[in-house]
Amino acid sequence: MLANRVERGRYFDSVALMRVARRIGALAGVEDAALMIGTPANKALLAQAGLLAPEGARAEPNDLVIAVRAAEPTAALELALRLLA
């Protein structure tokens, strides 16, 4: 199941986002994960990877998009937020 979560007005360094995405992607049951700022270019990359859901498509350039494809994405989305805190 594909799930996106948008955190409005949250900006993070791309290196930090890649580290969290790698940890989320390594979880059991997670097929793929990405965390990106909601710029048009980043949303295009998410779409090409098959990770852009309607919620993520509505993200603005100052928003964080957390994208997860997993059997149960809720736990992965929540862990991503905790790791960024």
Identify the residue ranges that each predicted region occupies.
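Non-catalytic terminal accessory/regulatory regions of metabolic enzymes
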Residues: M1-A85
